[in-house]
Regions:
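Rossmann-like adenosine-cofactor binding region
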Residues: 41-45, 163-260
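Glycine-rich Rossmann-fold phosphate-binding loop(s) that bind the pyrophosphate
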Residues: 140-141
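An N-terminal-biased, well-structured beta-alpha scaffold segment characteristic
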Residues: 1-79, 206
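C-terminal helix-to-coil terminal segments
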Residues: 72, 79-91, 106-107, 119-126, ...
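Short beta->alpha connector loops at strand-helix junctions that form conserved
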Residues: 11-12, 59-60, 75-87, 162, ...
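Conserved beta-strand positions in the Rossmann-like core of class I SAM-dependent methyltransferases
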Residues: 9, 159, 226
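Phosphate-coordination loops involved in phosphoryl transfer and adenosine-cofactor binding
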Residues: 53, 131-134, 207, 216
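Phosphate-binding beta-alpha-beta segment of Rossmann-like dinucleotide-binding domains, i.e.
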Residues: 82-134, 146-149, 163, 168
């Protein structure tokens, strides 16, 4: 789509993002940048692109990898892919709820390793119920609400905490109850994170909150890794303050080969695949391309982060 209207330089290599030097070289004197959340787009990258840069189109919903304030100051539009990935990410969040509580990965490994010797056993891989439990959601926005809809099919009680405004629609439609953060962590059987990453939410889940969680509860994160203090989470898992965790995101991606998380049996770890379905990723690519082309053609982007920008 883009190559029909623009000269395109591809910086990424399949299987890995571009290095910093590769990125700085690729953006030189460009009118537009189409990036992913693995690409840190800061003032130095904008300097390398030069005065022609008009738009930074992110192939993602989150834009915490882009210096929005700097782009706006320079008159550069920043676009994102909106709510396209909502349902796919909600599916994965609920998959992690089921996988952690019912020991699905442990069961798969038991069978494939040929260590399952004696058929049905009344004590084999006993997990935790999901139906009828309490789901706590941090950030009852688009994705959090989609997870809540799925939870109602399991007769779960829904409590939530938003850092700012309440979600009155979800309260009325699904009986979701807004509580403070302390009550949320204390009462949740499953705590699922769906808020954006910013200075207020960075390390929102740390030792003080983890210690207040039930020792048979689980934490699920499909949002951003930096919402959780990973060192504190590892401590909580080792000392059994909580029963387990399902993580699609990490503080550093990929996690260090020496991370204790990789050795734990009470975690399910995924490589940041919340939106990874053929249909969702295709739609994201189309929107990212349209956003970029719309700006270059002096049209309105579909999803714009900084509408207040004074264009170059």
């Amino acid at each position: 789509m883009i190559s029909k209207e623009c000269s395109v330089i591809v910086a990424n290599h399949r299987g890995r993002p571009p290095t910093r030097d590769e990125l700085l070289k690729a953006v030189r004197d460009k009118d537009a940048i189409l990036c992913t959340l693995s690409d840190m787009i800061d003032a130095k990258v904008m300097d390398a692109a030069g005065s022609n840069l008009k738009v930074i189109s992110s192939y993602s919903t989150g834009t915490d990898h882009i210096d929005i304030k700097e782009a706006t100051k320079r008159g550069i539009y920043v676009t994102f892919t909106g709510d396209i990935l909502t349902e796919a990410t909600a599916d994965l969040a609920f998959a992690l709820i089921l996988a952690t509580s019912r020991q699905i990965t442990q069961g798969h490994e038991l069978v494939t390793s040929k260590r399952w010797k004696y058929g049905w056993d009344p004590h084999l891989l006993l997990g935790s119920d999901v139906h009828g439990t309490t789901l706590g959601i941090v950030g009852l926005g688009r994705i959090g609400s989609a997870v809540a809809r799925r939870a109602k099919g399991f007769d779960m009680d829904i409590i939530y905490h938003n850092l700012h405004s309440r979600n009155i629609q979800m309260e009325e439609q699904f009986g979701a109850k807004h509580v403070d953060m302390s009550q949320l962590v204390e009462e949740s059987d499953f705590l699922s994170l769906h808020c954006s990453l910013n200075s207020e939410s960075y390390h929102l889940i740390s030792e003080s909150n983890l210690r207040r969680m039930k020792n048979d509860s689980y934490i699920i994160n499909t949002a951003r890794g930096q919402l959780i203090n990973e060192a504190h989470l590892i401590k909580a898992l080792k000392q059994r303050w909580i029963a387990g965790a399902g993580l699609d995101v990490f503080e550093k991606e990929p996690p260090s080969p020496n991370s204790s998380l990789l050795k734990m049996k009470n975690v399910v770890l995924l490589p940041h695949i919340g939106s990874a379905t053929f249909l969702t990723r295709t739609k994201m690519a189309e929107v990212a391309a349209k956003n970029l082309l719309n700006v270059l053609n002096r049209k309105t982007a579909i999803y714009l982060v900084n509408p207040e920008v004074n264009p170059r």
